[in-house]
Amino acid sequence: MADFFASSFWTGFLWPLIVMIAQSVLLLVVLLVAIAYILLADRKIWAAVQIRRGPNVVGPWGLFQSFADLLKFVLKEPIIPAGANKGVFLLAPLVSCVLALAAWAVIPTNLGWAIADINVGILFIFAISSLSIYGIIMAGWSSNSKYPFLAALRSAAQMVSYEVSIGFVIITVLLCAGTLNLSAVVEAQHARGLASLIGLPQLTILNWYVWPLFPMFVVFYVSALAETNRPPFDLVEAESELVAGFMVEYGSTPYLLFMLGEYVAITTMCALATILFLGGWLPPIDLPPFNWVPGVIWFALKLFFMFFLIAMAKAIVPRYRYDQLMRLGWKVFLPLSLVMVVIVAGVLHFAGIAPK
């Protein structure tokens, strides 16, 4: 009996726990290395637009610049302002970073490649992205300074404005896919769509939701910029107005955690756009040599394409005024996304093509 309970404990609890921890550590390492090079790519793209070289000294072509920056931040001493609430001040960057990383627990980068392939994966990511505002509000309030506090208030209003639009975008995709499971959303873009209707099922690129839902793709792209405080919606950390926004009192490792959380959140939005609109890990053409390439490579290429679009917005679009930002969210995107939900639902119902 004792042997039975011991074996049940090992196979039913301990071994799955060890596997999950190993998967989490592997994902964390891969994600952090990817973020280092995404940050470098962001700086390189910005430099190319401005006809500069960008980071090119540390390592060949500047490939180790992000690791040099990491070492610099870690070796600096964190300074806490005299009037700050020390506990909340130090907890804020940790909250921001951990919540951003937690979203990747449900994101599949290939078929079956997810730590937790839950049936409500989209809702989980939506909830995590909504909670990320708390790290910024904690930082703004605990710094005991007017610039971070004003940035925190801006951030709260900005994220509430664009969360609603992103929610309606997700609803339109769910109507087409018929599921909240992220892997099932990708598989739905392989099984049915325009390519199947015209008798060319190998052209999976025609099944991607970016084509029938292109207005919602644009809304998602712009809302993702606002959600992650990226230019031209970087009013939370506007250098010309608020110095560095909610991070003005931060330095050393806490500042590094905020930057890490910001770029992980950007990467999460790119991954979500890849899954919802660009077919996830599916090749554009389901024929050799395209389907010889591993799905995770296609996923990474599409993710970087989305990041390139976000980086280009930083380089070429001027910053919006705060009232313009609010007007765009509430008077343009919210009505547009709501109308699109009604149109998509009507077309699916009356055409008889709604998923069963």
From Swiss-Prot:
Organism annotation:
Bradyrhizobium sp. (strain BTAi1 / ATCC BAA-1182)
- State the reactions this protein catalyses: a quinone + NADH + 5 H(+)(in) = a quinol + NAD(+) + 4 H(+)(out)
Q: Where is the signal peptide?
A: none
- What biological processes does GO assign it? aerobic respiration
Q: Which domain of life is it from?
A: Bacteria
Indicate where this protein is primarily found: membrane
Oligomeric state and interaction partners are given as:
NDH-1 is composed of 14 different subunits. Subunits NuoA, H, J, K, L, M, N constitute the membrane sector of the complex.
Protein's name according to its UniProt entry = NADH-quinone oxidoreductase subunit H
Record key words, sorted: Cell inner membrane, Cell membrane, Membrane, NAD, Quinone, Translocase, Transmembrane, Transmembrane helix, Ubiquinone
Q: Which GO terms describe its cellular component?
A: plasma membrane
User: Which purpose does this protein serve, as stated in its record?
Assistant: NDH-1 shuttles electrons from NADH, via FMN and iron-sulfur (Fe-S) centers, to quinones in the respiratory chain. The immediate electron acceptor for the enzyme in this species is believed to be ubiquinone. Couples the redox reaction to proton translocation (for every two electrons transferred, four hydrogen ions are translocated across the cytoplasmic membrane), and thus conserves the redox energy in a proton gradient. This subunit may bind ubiquinone.
Question: What is the recorded membrane topology of this protein?
Answer: Multi-pass membrane protein
Supply one GO molecular-function term. quinone binding
The EC number on file is 7.1.1.-
Localization per record = Cell inner membrane
Keyword hit for Nucleotidyltransferase: no
The family classification in the record reads: Belongs to the complex I subunit 1 family.
- Give the first-level EC class, as a single word: translocase
* TM spans (from-to): 18-38, 87-107, 120-140, 166-186, 205-225, 265-285, 292-312, 333-353
